[in-house]
């Protein structure tokens, strides 16, 4: 990447009624961090990939989403270990778990929204009371856990885990070694709920972890697992990719095959989606030994405050630094 154009890029530019600026983001050498990006403030908070393992939604009194941390760095082209979740294929927490029987029952986060995570992937979609890890009981106004999982941690250790309940605003869950030793029971209270709130938990510290910036964030830049084609472009399978996800409460729409200087957000104002990977990872491609950026693609991002930004990604340096740069244009508050 040419440093000279970056210096020039950070000069504040006014085009018509809108202001353009450039924002530098990074997920570190070897993609070893997650970046929580605030577009308006032009800031980011960096968190180590292994800072947390589970994330519980705390958006309202009705949600019960639970995510795993799929972020993993790389070294010499090889992915480092990450948190993995499997169906234990047993009925009771005390049952014997056979690891060889669970290898084909892995659960991943879906990038469809922040409503459901990996722990919710086994739910029956047509049943609004089914949260995957448990079912809502209307008469008791609680979610009762009914599924046992196995977590493979980054250090190679296995833990069995059960989300026992969500009563009111309190999650209760337990985990232990596969032989039942070192059992830990934890509770997490959602309060105060917020439309953008996730509560992060570390299996290493056995406690809640402070991950997100105090002033909020709009984007997450780092690693996650997604369907992607192999380097030859022939086989599509799950890969650990480097990309940008929108945060809870943030929506986005992609404008592809356009002139990024003249494209209007008004043509896309009815197409915003809460799907988290609208920006995703495929705005870049490895050509030989260097990265090429799609120059006919813009993204319109609507933040929690209903402010609309045009995002055009300008540069990506790969695993050597994890650095990227995007151009941002403040388009003001949306009336929709």
Question: Which residue stretches match the model-derived regions?
Answer:
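Bacterial Sec-dependent N-terminal signal peptides
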Residues: 1-24, 336
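Surface-exposed, beta-sheet-biased, low-hydrophobicity segments with strongly acidic/polar composition
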Residues: 20-336
């Amino acid at each position: 990447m040419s440093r000279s154009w970056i210096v020039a890029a950070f000069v504040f530019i006014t085009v018509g009624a809108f202001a353009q600026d450039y924002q530098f983001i990074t997920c570190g050498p070897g993609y070893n961090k997650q970046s929580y990006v605030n577009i308006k403030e032009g800031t980011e908070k960096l968190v180590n990939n292994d800072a947390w393992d589970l994330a519980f939604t705390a958006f309202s009194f009705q949600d019960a989403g639970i995510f795993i941390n799929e972020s993993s760095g790389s070294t010499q082209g090889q992915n480092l270990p990450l948190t993995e979740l499997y169906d234990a294929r047993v009925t009771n927490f005390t049952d014997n778990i056979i690891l060889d029987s669970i290898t084909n029952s892995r659960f991943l986060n879906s990038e469809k929204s922040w409503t459901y995570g990996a722990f919710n992937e086994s739910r029956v979609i047509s049943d609004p009371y089914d949260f995957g890890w448990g079912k809502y009981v209307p008469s008791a106004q609680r979610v009762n856990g009914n599924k046992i999982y196995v977590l493979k941690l980054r250090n190679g250790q296995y833990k069995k885990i059960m989300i026992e309940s969500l009563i009111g605003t309190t999650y209760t869950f337990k985990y232990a070694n596969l032989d039942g030793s070192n059992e830990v029971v934890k509770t997490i209270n959602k309060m105060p709920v917020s439309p953008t709130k996730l509560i992060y938990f570390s299996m290493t510290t056995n406690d809640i972890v402070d991950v997100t910036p105090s002033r909020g964030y709009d984007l997450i830049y780092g690693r996650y697992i997604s369907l992607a084609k192999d380097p030859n472009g022939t086989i599509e399978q799950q890969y650990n990719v480097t990309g940008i996800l929108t945060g809870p409460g943030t929506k986005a729409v992609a404008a592809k095959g356009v002139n990024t200087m003249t494209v209007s957000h008004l043509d896309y104002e009815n197409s915003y989606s809460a799907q988290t990977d609208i920006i995703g990872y495929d705005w870049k491609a490895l050509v030989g030994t260097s990265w090429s950026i799609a120059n006919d693609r813009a993204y319109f991002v609507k933040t929690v405050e209903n402010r609309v930004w045009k995002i055009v990604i300008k540069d990506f340096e790969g695993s050597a630094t994890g650095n990227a740069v995007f151009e941002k244009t403040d388009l003001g508050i949306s009336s929709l």
